[in-house]
Structures are given as C-alpha cells and as structure tokens.
Amino acid sequence: MVLQHYNTPENLRGRAMPVQGMEMLSTVARELHISEEELLKQGLHGFLTHQLRAIKAEIFEISGRYGISSVAEMEARYRDGTLEEADSWRDLQRLDHLEYRRDRLVQLLEAVA
C-alpha cells in the first residue's frame, strides 16, 4: 500500500502563504532583527526537532517494552519464537510507522539545514 502525503514540501511549493501569515512573519522577523527566510528556517527547524523528539520518545518506550532496538529486531524475535506476536503486533505496527516518521523527519531536517 502506498501512502500519499498531500502536505509535503514538494506539494506545497508554489502556494502562497495567507496574508495574515506573511504579516506575522514580517512583524516577528523585524522585531528579532533577522530575515523572514531565516525566521522561517529556524521555525521549521525547531518544529521538526520537537516532532522528532516526540517520535523518538515513543520509539524508546516501545523498544524498551520488548528489549529491542528496531522493527527488524522485533520481527527477528517473532521468527525465533522469543516474542509472542499475539500480544505485540499492534506495537510492531506502531513502531514501524514511528520509524518511518522518524526517518522522514530526519530527511526534512537535513533539507531545512
């Protein structure tokens, strides 16, 4: 299954920011004596960093629960019989999603840097 992400930077490129947003950006940049571009860059970096921290915390929680470090390791434990799938499959799915989001946030942070 392919998930489509409509609000990716690629899909939003070329769209105009609402006037209120532009005015707010301009006002804050002026108050901080930085360019609007730098303010946007720092704001995006801070937001993405915050999101990444939350994702990593949830990954840490699930990983600690099963004594694993990744989805691959959890799947290996299923295969060797040291982890019951019936009790943990939802966490496996959640961890898989979180790892994808973590990797995507890292890519976005690199693009913003």
Where are these regions (language model features)?
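Small, basic N-terminal interaction modules of short regulatory proteins
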Residues: M1-R77, Y100-A113
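Short, glycine/alanine-rich amphipathic alpha-helical segment
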Residues: R79-R94
